[in-house]
């Protein structure tokens, strides 16, 4: 049986790394980061396993950036929630205890509701549409820098979460009525809670690392995620009914301490951003390959892939846009994102 250590374990890991949760910036001297003759270590938190495309792309980013800077910078990637849940590590970045993290959009929308524009059903039509938008600096900079002054967080870019679907432990879901009474794990987001409610289920926010055990024990009846996470986290073992709702193209964000980004020499910062852009491309390529492999693995394991009533779910979700896009900025950003959908492949 899989279990997740209590949150205090995350703090013990932080302590063992010589980090602090207060504003001493995790021991980094911003006046000397990246100096010749020394290595500046950046700790990057990830909630995925070592087999996940995000981990692979980040490890390769680390190697390239270390080589490009002659060893002056080294990114250390900590997978599997070793440094804490996404909610915890976002606070660690904010306080300076660690330097970077990959977090979901739901975490950022809890800090600034404008992020929910990129985190709602119907925003993106495809992964290519999504990645084209994320690379559009003119469009994204006001949002991505909105937490810099208040929370010391810069959003650097994002990794696709792919297309998200429902999966359940007992019985196929074809229409919203089939989800009635079922407890479905969602991320801690008011919009995602409402999304599952509109789709017919009972939304249950829960940490990602606890989902397997919760479904195994019957605390949950299902969850929603992409095929890669569905298989790499072995959720298909306990929830073998996969309904192709395709209700959302999700996004993970790379967040970084804003003061550290500003403290980097201009050439190092440019190198880092170039290598990050390459990491986004690599991640998307890996994602597409891994999605197909995950589908084949799940199918071989006996997963029941269910075609849903797409029209019924589309109608059920229709109210969410008017409910959550409540400001001119949000509505204008949504329309700009939709207008950027050219149907072409992302770089």
What are these regions (language model features)?
Residues 2-11, 17, 23-127, 154-347:
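N-terminal secretory/targeting leader peptides
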Residues 127-145:
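A gly/proline- and charged-residue-enriched helix-loop-helix capping module
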Residues 151:
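Short, glycine-/small-residue-rich phosphate/pyrophosphate-handling segment
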């Amino acid at each position: 049986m899989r279990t997740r250590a209590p949150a205090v374990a995350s703090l013990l890991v932080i302590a063992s790394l010589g980090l602090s949760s207060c504003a001493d910036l995790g021991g980094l001297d911003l006046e000397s980061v990246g100096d010749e003759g020394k290595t500046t270590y950046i700790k990057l938190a990830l909630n995925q396993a070592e087999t996940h495309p995000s981990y692979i792309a980040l490890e390769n980013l680390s190697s390239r950036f270390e080589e490009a800077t002659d060893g002056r910078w080294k990114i250390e990637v900590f997978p599997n929630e070793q440094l804490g849940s996404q909610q915890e590590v976002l606070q660690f970045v904010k306080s300076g205890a660690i330097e970077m993290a990959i977090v979901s959009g739901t975490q950022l929308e809890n800090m600034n509701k404008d992020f929910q524009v990129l985190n709602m059903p119907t925003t993106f039509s495809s992964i290519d549409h999504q990645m084209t938008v994320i690379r559009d600096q003119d469009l994204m900079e006001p949002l991505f820098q909105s937490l810099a002054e208040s929370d010391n967080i810069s959003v650097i870019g994002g990794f696709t979460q792919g297309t998200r679907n429902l999966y359940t432990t007992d019985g196929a879901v074809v229409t919203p009525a089939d989800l009635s009474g079922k407890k479905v794990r969602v991320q801690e987001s008011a919009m995602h809670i409402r999304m599952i409610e509109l789709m017919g289920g009972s939304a249950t926010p829960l940490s990602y690392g606890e989902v397997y055990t919760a479904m195994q024990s019957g605390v949950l009846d299902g969850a929603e995620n992409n095929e890669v996470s569905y298989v790499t986290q072995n959720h298909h073992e306990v929830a073998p009914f996969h309904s192709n709702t395709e209700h959302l193209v999700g996004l993970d964000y790379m967040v970084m301490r804003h003061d550290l980004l500003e403290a980097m020499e201009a050439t190092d910062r440019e190198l880092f951003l170039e290598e990050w852009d390459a990491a986004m491309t690599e991640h998307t390529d890996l994602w597409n390959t891994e999605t197909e492999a995950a589908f084949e693995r799940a199918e071989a394991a006996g997963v029941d892939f269910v075609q849903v009533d797409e029209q019924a779910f589309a109608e059920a979700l229709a109210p969410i846009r008017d409910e959550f896009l409540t400001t001119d900025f949000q509505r204008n950003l949504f329309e700009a994102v939709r207008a950027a959908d050219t149907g072409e492949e992302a770089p």
